Amino acid sequence: MRPSGRQPDQLRPVTLTRKFTRHAEGSVLVCFGDTQVLCTASVLPKVPPHKKGSGEGWVTAEYGMLPRSTHTRSDREAARGKQSGRTQEIQRLIGRAMRTVFDLRALGEHTLHLDCDVLQADGGTRTASITGAFVAAYDAVSVMREKGQLVGDPVRDFVAAVSVGVVDGVPVLDLDYPEDSACDTDMNVVMTGSGGFVEVQGTAEGTPFSRAEMDAMLGLADQGIRTLISLQKQALGL
């Protein structure tokens, strides 16, 4: 039995609360159990230098954790004067995941800027960020459509993410913090609604994992992401 009482193939309770803040074109509070992330999507009338004059837009992301989102307070990265390698890795992952399912040409020369701020961390903050950021981006695109800012429909597919791992020799879905800190293997999987893999990040924590365990973890991730995409569609009224 897992510490949370869940079955190996069971997600934590997941909620996606849209229009959580007032000013951003898209905003979502995403909760995976006790992990809470505020995802906002802003539409900017400009693109990075490498996209200027191309007729294409851009999708990018920033990620951060509030000082007391974890058990002990950590300094703000702004106070330290630089982002950690972990932060940079996660925000690049979020941006890559979004660009996989957006047609940049249909955005015109606009940037969708996603901000993912962790309010409370209990494992899986990067996967929750991706899952919530897509819904925020979808809402931002709807605002662009209403304003006549789009060249076409930029949303090509849905995208979501989940963590999987091996804990005490058992492959499990959606690790919380106690499991994440004690697991034999930790893997983050990003997939599209059509079943394509966007990213697979897997690391053994001391004990190598077998091909059978990897296949089992990917199977759990596929199942979990299908459920998450259904929840995204439900939240969007689709």
Curated annotation (Swiss-Prot):
The keyword tRNA-binding applies. Residues 66-88 are annotated as: Disordered. Disulfide bonds: none annotated. InterPro entries: ExoRNase_PH_dom1, ExoRNase_PH_dom2, ExoRNase_PH_dom2_sf, PNPase/RNase_PH_dom_sf, Ribosomal_Su5_D2-typ_SF, RNase_PH, RNase_PH_bac-type, RNase_PH_CS. Signal peptide: none annotated. GO terms for molecular function: 3'-5'-RNA exonuclease activity; tRNA binding; tRNA nucleotidyltransferase activity. It catalyses: tRNA(n+1) + phosphate = tRNA(n) + a ribonucleoside 5'-diphosphate. Keywords: Nucleotidyltransferase, RNA-binding, rRNA processing, Transferase, tRNA processing, tRNA-binding. GO terms for biological process: rRNA catabolic process; rRNA processing; tRNA processing. Phosphate binds at R86, G124, T125, R126. Its EC number is 2.7.7.56. SUPFAM superfamilies: Ribonuclease PH domain 2-like (SSF55666), Ribosomal protein S5 domain 2-like (SSF54211). Belongs to the RNase PH family. PANTHER family: EXOSOME COMPLEX COMPONENT, EXOSOME COMPLEX COMPONENT RRP41. Phosphorolytic 3'-5' exoribonuclease that plays an important role in tRNA 3'-end maturation. Removes nucleotide residues following the 3'-CCA terminus of tRNAs; can also add nucleotides to the ends of RNA molecules by using nucleoside diphosphates as substrates, but this may not be physiologically important. Probably plays a role in initiation of 16S rRNA degradation (leading to ribosome degradation) during starvation. Homohexameric ring arranged as a trimer of dimers. This is Ribonuclease PH. The lineage of its organism: Bacteria, Pseudomonadati, Pseudomonadota, Betaproteobacteria, Burkholderiales. The gene is rph.
